């Protein structure tokens, strides 16, 4: 018989830098999960990823205090900022533009994120990412 699921915990944790401090410690502690076990397992799985890159993780907590977790791809906004070497998006996206991104760059990001997106094709994913870029104040070229 399958284990009884008591809840899901969604967090964004920097790659290779999971530690028991907030937000990880309190979130896992509430469910009675072993915090250090998660930190060690997460850091081991994210060794090949660029350190500090925020990764969404979904932790499934079971009734017997065990857990499993799934690491997703980095948020689209982080990948867009990284692609155009930007520190942060525009505070007013309509009037203040902070950079430009090409369709080719968006296609690279779309191929990375496709498994975590609800888009049917790379082209649909590119259009979704273009919307995210525009909302950050980034001009999209070639779309």
Curated annotation (Swiss-Prot):
<dbReference type="InterPro" id="IPR020784">
    <property type="entry name" value="Ribosomal_uL11_N"/>
</dbReference>
<dbReference type="GO" id="GO:0006412">
    <property type="term" value="P:translation"/>
</dbReference>
<comment type="subunit">
    <text>Part of the ribosomal stalk of the 50S ribosomal subunit. Interacts with L10 and the large rRNA to form the base of the stalk. L10 forms an elongated spine to which L12 dimers bind in a sequential fashion forming a multimeric L10(L12)X complex.</text>
</comment>
<comment type="similarity">
    <text>Belongs to the universal ribosomal protein uL11 family.</text>
</comment>
<dbReference type="InterPro" id="IPR036796">
    <property type="entry name" value="Ribosomal_uL11_N_sf"/>
</dbReference>
<keyword id="KW-0488">Methylation</keyword>
<dbReference type="Pfam" id="PF03946">
    <property type="entry name" value="Ribosomal_L11_N"/>
</dbReference>
<keyword id="KW-0694">RNA-binding</keyword>
<protein>
    <recommendedName>
        <fullName>Large ribosomal subunit protein uL11</fullName>
    </recommendedName>
</protein>
<dbReference type="GO" id="GO:0070180">
    <property type="term" value="F:large ribosomal subunit rRNA binding"/>
</dbReference>
<dbReference type="InterPro" id="IPR036769">
    <property type="entry name" value="Ribosomal_uL11_C_sf"/>
</dbReference>
<dbReference type="InterPro" id="IPR000911">
    <property type="entry name" value="Ribosomal_uL11"/>
</dbReference>
<dbReference type="InterPro" id="IPR020785">
    <property type="entry name" value="Ribosomal_uL11_CS"/>
</dbReference>
<dbReference type="InterPro" id="IPR006519">
    <property type="entry name" value="Ribosomal_uL11_bac-typ"/>
</dbReference>
<keyword id="KW-0687">Ribonucleoprotein</keyword>
<dbReference type="Pfam" id="PF00298">
    <property type="entry name" value="Ribosomal_L11"/>
</dbReference>
<dbReference type="InterPro" id="IPR020783">
    <property type="entry name" value="Ribosomal_uL11_C"/>
</dbReference>
<keyword id="KW-0689">Ribosomal protein</keyword>
<comment type="function">
    <text>Forms part of the ribosomal stalk which helps the ribosome interact with GTP-bound translation factors.</text>
</comment>
<dbReference type="GO" id="GO:0022625">
    <property type="term" value="C:cytosolic large ribosomal subunit"/>
</dbReference>
<keyword id="KW-0699">rRNA-binding</keyword>
<dbReference type="GO" id="GO:0003735">
    <property type="term" value="F:structural constituent of ribosome"/>
</dbReference>
């Amino acid at each position: 018989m399958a284990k009884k699921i008591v809840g899901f915990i969604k967090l964004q944790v920097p790659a290779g830098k999971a530690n028991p401090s907030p937000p990880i410690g309190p979130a896992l502690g509430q469910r009675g999960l072993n915090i250090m076990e998660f930190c060690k397992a997460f850091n081991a799985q994210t060794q090949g990823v660029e350190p500090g890159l925020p990764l969404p993780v979904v932790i499934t907590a079971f009734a017997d205090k065990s857990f499993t977790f799934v690491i997703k791809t980095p948020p689209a906004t982080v990948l867009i900022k990284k692609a155009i070497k930007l520190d942060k998006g525009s505070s007013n996206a309509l009037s203040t533009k902070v950079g430009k991104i090409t369709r080719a760059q968006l296609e690279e990001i779309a191929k990375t994120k496709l498994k975590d997106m609800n888009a049917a094709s790379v082209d649909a994913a590119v259009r979704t990412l273009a919307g995210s870029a525009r909302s950050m104040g980034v001009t999209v070229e070639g779309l």
